[in-house]
Amino acid sequence: MLSFGGSLLSHSDIASRNKFSIDYSQFKAFFPGNWKFSNSKDKKPVRSPTLDEPVGDVDIDIFDVSKFYPLKRLSSIPEKIRANYHEELQTTSYDLVRNPFTHGLFCVVFYHQNKSYLKMGVTDNFNAFEEDSRVYQYGVNHKLSCKNLLLAINYSPKTYTKIFDFLRNGRAPLQVLVHHCMLYNFYPEDFQDALWCAVQAHVMNQVRLGRATLLHARACYQKIGDIRMYLIDPHDLYFSPNSLKWLIICSKQFQALVHLEVKMDTLKIFRRRSKYFNLARSCVSGFELSWLIMMTSIGSNASAVPVHAYLASKRILYPSIIPEEIFFMRKFDSSLFKDIKNIHELLGFLGRLFMDLQDCEKFHHDYTEYHCYRIGKPLYQNYEEEALRKKSQGVKDADFIKPLVTNTRTAEKYKAFFEYKRNIVLKKQS
């Protein structure tokens, strides 16, 4: 993929040299035969596109992604640093892996004139787009969407407050977490902090399952990189043998080529003045170091990556491969990017928030039952302790009786189970 000649310049770098026009001879010199980039020839001002409207004046084509390197084989790691990990990281032709993509969603995220664009389409060829592929611009009507989101928060503060508490305490299911992470750029700072807390809990759960390392958790606690990238399996990340400015996210039914903001380079994070210096020193493998380099290089383009489509292709989120929306998970989210003249136009989005709250409450209830099962503590014992605590504080017992009655079957089931396990242990000891 991307066999460049000469220095590696992106289309945004070249376009920035001339504010009014693009010199196509420069593209021919630096991107011979690999890229097809076209702008509208009409001199009239181009109308700003809507969120789900394709852009007709920008296009980009790419081919030859049949083989690439896993991210852990990042070739920019110097020899002195490689020696610290006691492992061979020199990339050879034997390290090239075949593209696992068979069919599904194929997309390219790229910069142009300080804007992020996403070209996407459904195909069964990892080297070409179908004719019905389209290019979309990310971040359309950013100020308007922030305003509408604040309007929704002010209209239903109780719902948002409860969702905020679930996110901050790490008690939100994955579908709710992904839904709000894809709206991250439009939320106020307090809600963004709550989303980071929820993602931190998600990453720590992945660490317990052996799917992530402590470095991923440390980086998440320091809020390094884009929040959406922590939802992607690090083993699905690759890079091109000819360019370190492109990241490849690939699975059997999803492929995304992401244009990085800066070139992936290890030396920049190992400078003592770098804010990533201490974190880079804690890396225990080249795989961790390569991932950290990628997170510090990706920039804002990760916001346009359809993470919900990636999780859907992995059968993690929901079974559909093709998402309903391009940049967002729910179809009602598109109402945030329109000129709202009446609060009734946001009722669909507000209804979706209420459903998110119900999902959080159900997840919290199921988590409580699982936690009691895992630590060997019956569920009914939680209610007894809660009743004693409220009684000592002078709280009436009415709040305790209702959940105890509604969970009688569950309590009896766990009580019988733990008594059975206790009898087995006592027999073995005797």
Curated annotation (Swiss-Prot):
Its biological purpose:
Has a role in meiosis.
Name any GO cellular component annotation. mitochondrion
From which source organism is this entry? Schizosaccharomyces pombe (strain 972 / ATCC 24843) (Fission yeast)
Keyword check for Protein biosynthesis, yes or no.
no
Listed A to Z, the keywords are: Meiosis, Mitochondrion
> Cellular location of this protein?
Mitochondrion
**What family does this chain come from, according to its entry?**
Belongs to the UPF0300 family.
Please identify the protein, giving its name as recorded. Meiotically up-regulated gene 132 protein
Q: Which Pfam families match?
A: UPF0300 (PF08594)
Q: Which GO terms describe its biological process?
A: meiotic cell cycle
UniProt KW Mitochondrion keyword: yes
